[in-house]
Amino acid sequence: MSKNKYTIAQILPALNTGGVERGVVEISKALTESNFRSIVISSGGHFESQLRRNGTIHYKLDVHSKNPLRWVKIRNQLKVILEEEKVDLLHLCSRAPAWIAFPLGSILDIPVITSVHMRFRKTNIFKKIYNSVLTKGDAIIAISKHIEKSIKTVFPKVGHKINIIHRGVDLELFNPNNIKAGRIIAQSKILNLRDNVPVIVMASRPAMWKGYSVLITALSKVKEDFQCVLIGAGDGSTKFQKILIDKIIRLKLEAKVKLLKSTRDIQAAMILGDIVVMPSLTPEPFCRVILEAQALGKIPIAFDHGGASETIIDGKNGFLAKPVDVDSLSKKISLALSLKGSQREKIGEFAKKNVSKNFSHDKMCKLTLSLYKRCLAEYKR
């Protein structure tokens, strides 16, 4: 295939908050800045305005539907869009849209790339069949080595198609020098922090598997002085919050641990912290929060599994605890709190260099666009 300006269509369920959604927005911007035409098709969401600003065309379509009875109608609507826009390559970012869109690759005679953001497990045959659509493309993007391994475990014959492209951090957005004093002061008032007491931050959505309860237990064993803000826990249900608050009271941590709602300025909130903990009980596919903390020069602590194992070198740019081990997590937190200022600075500098070299937004976009170009060049060669 030879053409002056290729059109790439990314398809995903919706454009609300999440790593998949942010990745699509970032790639779409990189496409328009690199002489590609960028199309995104989804059921919509608040990221639509960002797409319009970067020159991407967005089509609203019910590609999030998991009802097979609707797929033929939606596929026909999608086919019209792809033909009218003369799309040259499809990038499918989730399972339901992939089941709808994948057949159009062969119908329209264009290459198809899929992204896998979730861990595949050896479950029942129906789940395996549902997941299998993400392995059928001309190329597969795995967002971490952990995800690559899970794909190969369940679908061993597709290993040759897998390309590991780690999710990236926007180094301008997460640059300490770019966070103005006014933003920090505003967040400081919201967090209501005590002066001269180390700050531990956990920022996540309100789900028990994210490790909120385990962290609270670990903190009860820490002898050093600290204050901890659980950002996002305050968005949880009344029942969810009650479980955590009851535990905080039972362990006599009321003066040290508080639940807060999520913030629109996570950069300013994290810059106020000394340590960022992400104690997910099950392996995270990647966990961008750990890298965002490193980009800000903070010390990340996580369990040694999933994506965290790929982004933290224990003792160099953060600390890894034994998976789901409260005592190990507590000891790592105590170790981080006991570091001298010069030791923290050394870890922070190593962390920033690690992100800049290996996990930047620019590197992610460059590798993804390079894969697009390769697939376009090789298709029907």
What are these regions (language model features)?
Residues 198, 328, 335, 342-358, ...:
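A short, well-ordered alpha-helix in the C-terminal region of glycosyltransferases
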Residues 18-26, 198-221, 242, 327, ...:
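A conserved mid-protein helix/loop that constitutes part of the nucleotide-sugar donor-binding site
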Residues 41-46, 169, 203, 227-242:
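Glycosyltransferase donor-sugar binding loop
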Residues 314-315, 319-326, 335-341:
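Conserved acidic donor-binding segment of nucleotide-sugar-dependent glycosyltransferases
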Residues 236-241, 254-263, 269, 319-320:
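Active-site donor-binding acidic/aromatic loop of nucleotide-activated sugar
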Residues 106, 112-143, 149, 156:
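A conserved, positively charged/aromatic
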Residues 92-98, 116:
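Short His-centered aromatic/hydrophobic patch
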Residues 40-41, 299-302, 312:
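Short hydrophobic beta-strand element within catalytic cores of glycosyltransferases
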